[in-house]
Regions:
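Iron-sulfur cluster-binding cysteine motifs and their immediate structural context
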Residues: 1-58
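Iron-sulfur-associated redox domains of electron-transfer enzymes in respiratory
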Residues: 48-186
Length: 186
């Protein structure tokens, strides 16, 4: 049984280094900010090679849907039969995160929670207990340095991570996945 850990929130009151096109995914705030040069989809786009590596095919191999949505293995539309309180789209995404933690498929989930003073401001959080996923309910579609928590995850020895984030965060994490020695990434 895992020991009870409280979620780790990121204090990002310090501004990130100024860069054109930067969405502040958080890589520039890590111990090795130079990784932006290889991880950022704006600085070093490598869509086809990452799609091939992750999905076994590229978006150009998949037809019109993939050209619009990006490469995918399978595509589903789903919602919970009984929506959860405080959830945006029924709570299915946070429920998937809960299940990954409950079944020990991941050590932690990187996601966003509301800021204590501004509920619309996304605050990066690293969650290790399924019961804490409730803190991440509700969609906060804004830029925040989620990946700055990768240093904390590494310090804690987390090798299996789930991520609930926006495309530029997921892209950067996938680009660094091998370098980070992750065993599993959901």
């Amino acid at each position: 049984m895992k020991t009870k850990e409280i979620p780790i929130f990121l204090d990002y009151s310090q501004s990130a280094p100024e860069r054109e096109l930067c969405t502040d995914c958080g890589i520039s705030r890590t111990t090795d900010p130079k990784r932006c040069g290889t991880a950022c989809q704006f600085i070093h786009p490598q869509y086809e090679s990452l799609e091939q590596k992750i999905h076994g095919k590229t978006r150009t191999d998949q037809g019109e849907d993939a050209l619009f949505f990006g490469s995918f293995r399978q595509m589903y539309r789903a919602k919970l039969k009984n929506p959860l309180p405080g959830a945006q789209w029924s709570g299915i995404t946070t429920s998937l995160g809960e299940k990954l933690l409950e079944t020990n498929q991941v050590d932690a989930i990187l996601t966003m929670a509301p800021d204590a003073l501004d509920p619309w401001k996304p605050t990066p959080i690293l969650i290790t207990q399924s019961t804490d996923m409730v803190k991440a309910r509700g969609m906060r579609m804004g830029y925040a340095p989620l990946l700055a928590l990768l240093d904390v995850a590494k310090e804690k020895g987390y090798k299996r991570l789930g991520i609930i984030g926006i495309p530029c965060q997921v892209y950067a994490l996938r680009a660094l996945e091998k370098e980070l020695s992750l065993e599993q990434l959901f």
